[in-house]
Amino acid sequence: MMDLELPPPGLPSQQDMDLIDILWRQDIDLGVSREVFDFSQRQKEHELEKQKKLEKERQEQLQKEQEKAFFAQLQLDEETGEFLPIQPAQHIPSETSGSANYSQVAPIPKADDLYFDDCMQLLAETFPFVDDNEVSSATFQSLVPDIPSHIESPVFTAPPQAQSPETLIVQVATAVLDDMQDIEQVWEELLSIPELQCLNIQNDKLAETSTVPSPETKLTEIDNYHFYSSMPSLDKEVGNCSPHFLNAFEDSFNSILSTEDSSQLTVNSLNSSATVNTDFGDEFYSAFIAEPSTSNGMPSSATLSQSLSELLNGPIDLSDLSLCKAFNQNHPESTTAEFNDSDSGISLNTTSPSMASPDHSVESSIYGDTLLGFSDSEMEEIDSTPGNVKQKGPKTPSVWPPGDPVQPLSSSQGNSAAARDSQCENAPKKEVPVSPGHRKTPFTKDKHSSRLEAHLTRDELRAKALHIPFPVEKIINLPVEDFNEMMSKEQFNEAQLALIRDIRRRGKNKVAAQNCRKRKLENIVELEQDLDHLKDEKEKLLKERGENDKSLHLLKKQLSTLYLEVFSMLRDENGKPYSPSEYSLQQTSDGNVFLVPKSKKPDTKKN
């Protein structure tokens, strides 16, 4: 036999290759390319599709991140439902930006640079809690002559070292200027933070700093400041000090200041130590202010103690307050102007006429609210009703100091009180301000317009600002033809036209959104009703099913009882009953019952 040479089993033969080519040509003729059968080609296409899919997912993720970053810069308008750009926080300019001393402008930091904890740390580092009176005290002590050793002064001590006053003054002035520039820069940074813009922060030191033209003026300012800071401690002990100490104090202090400055300084110091306004000082504290020719800048201890006892022990009639300058709207401002014009460069909160002490606020609130029994709304109603210029109500009771018994008035005092009451009744009615520092009463009829403007929407405020003669409701709710006719009758500029179109567009969008929400709510309510109906029907069907199961179970029980009863009545040829394990009863469609054995051979017996 001839042996046939077979090709290796791993390689196809030439005949197989020809056959494969023939089959491929047939597939190509049928529209199938050869790449369909190429596994490597299909794998490359699969990898390419996978890369395209991953690239698409990456692009979608990038687009989502861009949209998220874009919407983070917008805020949702609850009124119209559209997104508006967030307005950056405006920088609050400092009150001392126009000062001649400090022309340095601090850079405005970003809103995220400083937080509350950083601000507190910055304040703690900038403002160390030490007594600033040490420098001024040392400066003043260097110019005060030596006090005898047998007099113990609680305020002044001997200078620790001998140094020329001019050198010390120049050093102190330079240090104070540097510190104040740093303080101004710190406050500029603090006021630019959005978290602290809601606070009405006022820097008294920066607002009340004046120029220092010469070392002599700086010396006067330092000494005057120390004199003011030591006045509250001297008030309690001025009656017990010896005349020798008072004379030494007056001589040393008046040698520095002129007569005009010392008299003006006395007025301001008494005004600030008593924490009252200049208007109240003219009425109640006239005995405290001494003339330069008589007291030489300092009140005597007898006058001081007598005036204090009269003021504290005497009754205060609230009807007299209506005659006071502080409660008079058209009182002259010459006294305040004189006090503001100071050459010593010291300001004791008298530059701002609207600033009042807490005592005045309490007194005015008691006088205007508690004793008269009026609230803000009641005062507005009284102002708005005609015929209320002159009213006679219950007499205002006098206020006595706590702990003192009420003493009966003498005949002269009663006559004077009656005269004052009649004068107050005949005087034209003037409204009581919130505090004596206010020039105008807050209870004016302008409140009604301001309250109405507070309830206006943003579109109404814009339309009012651009003087659009149509109401916003008319712009939104008019049909197209009526709206075009209304617009053709007026001439508008570009800003007004853009605002009108914007108002109408957003109003229509708002109405459409409301209608959409209304339809959705109606659909939700309808679905809830259908769901409740289906629940009721389900409960009803479950109840019927339970009843049917019960009746079916009862029928089966009755049927089994009947089956056993009929089966027990059957007998075989020998008169024996049939065994239920071997036979069973079956009923045909015509109603006949047969006894059928359970074996395969049916041995039927008809009854």
UniProtKB/Swiss-Prot annotation:
Q: Which UniProt keywords apply?
A: Acetylation, Activator, Cytoplasm, DNA-binding, Glycation, Glycoprotein, Nucleus, Phosphoprotein, Transcription, Transcription regulation, Ubl conjugation
Locate the compositionally biased regions of type Polar residues: 333-355, 581-591
Q: How is it modified after translation?
A: Ubiquitinated in the cytoplasm by the BCR(KEAP1) E3 ubiquitin ligase complex leading to its degradation. In response to oxidative stress, electrophile metabolites, such as sulforaphane, modify KEAP1, leading to inhibit activity of the BCR(KEAP1) complex, promoting NFE2L2/NRF2 nuclear accumulation and activity. In response to autophagy, the BCR(KEAP1) complex is inactivated. Phosphorylated by EIF2AK3/PERK following unfolded protein response (UPR), promoting dissociation from its cytoplasmic inhibitor KEAP1, followed by its translocation into the nucleus. Phosphorylation of Ser-40 by PKC in response to oxidative stress dissociates NFE2L2 from its cytoplasmic inhibitor KEAP1, promoting its translocation into the nucleus.
Which Gene Ontology BP annotations are present? cell redox homeostasis; cellular response to fluid shear stress; cellular response to oxidative stress; negative regulation of ferroptosis; positive regulation of transcription by RNA polymerase II; proteasomal ubiquitin-independent protein catabolic process; proteasome-mediated ubiquitin-dependent protein catabolic process; protein ubiquitination
Q: Which PROSITE patterns match?
A: BZIP (PS50217), BZIP_BASIC (PS00036)
The record's principal subcellular location, in a coarse class, is: cytoplasm
- What positions are modified (N6-acetyllysine)? K598, K601
- Please report, in chain numbering, the residue ranges of the motif ETGE motif: 79-82
- Where does this protein reside within or beyond the cell? Cytoplasm, Cytosol; Nucleus
Q: How does it assemble?
A: Heterodimer; heterodimerizes with small Maf proteins. Interacts (via the bZIP domain) with MAFG and MAFK; required for binding to antioxidant response elements (AREs) on DNA. Interacts with KEAP1; the interaction is direct and promotes ubiquitination by the BCR(KEAP1) E3 ubiquitin ligase complex. Forms a ternary complex with PGAM5 and KEAP1. Interacts with EEF1D at heat shock promoter elements (HSE). Interacts via its leucine-zipper domain with the coiled-coil domain of PMF1. Interacts with CHD6; involved in activation of the transcription.
Domain note: The ETGE motif, and to a lower extent the DLG motif, mediate interaction with KEAP1.
Give the family from UniProt. Belongs to the bZIP family. CNC subfamily.
Summarizing the function annotation, the protein's role is: Transcription factor that plays a key role in the response to oxidative stress: binds to antioxidant response (ARE) elements present in the promoter region of many cytoprotective genes, such as phase 2 detoxifying enzymes, and promotes their expression, thereby neutralizing reactive electrophiles. In normal conditions, ubiquitinated and degraded in the cytoplasm by the BCR(KEAP1) complex.
Q: What is this protein called?
A: Nuclear factor erythroid 2-related factor 2
Which organism does this sequence originate in? Bos taurus
